[in-house]
Amino acid sequence: AEPVEPWS
């Protein structure tokens, strides 16, 4: 899985 910021 790629490290992505938790945006909505």
From Swiss-Prot:
Q: Which domain of life is it from?
A: Eukaryota
- What this chain does, per the record? Inhibitor of the proliferation of hepatic stellate cells (HSC). Also inhibits the growth of bovine endothelial cells and 3T6 fibroblasts.
The protein, known as: Non-arginase growth inhibitory factor
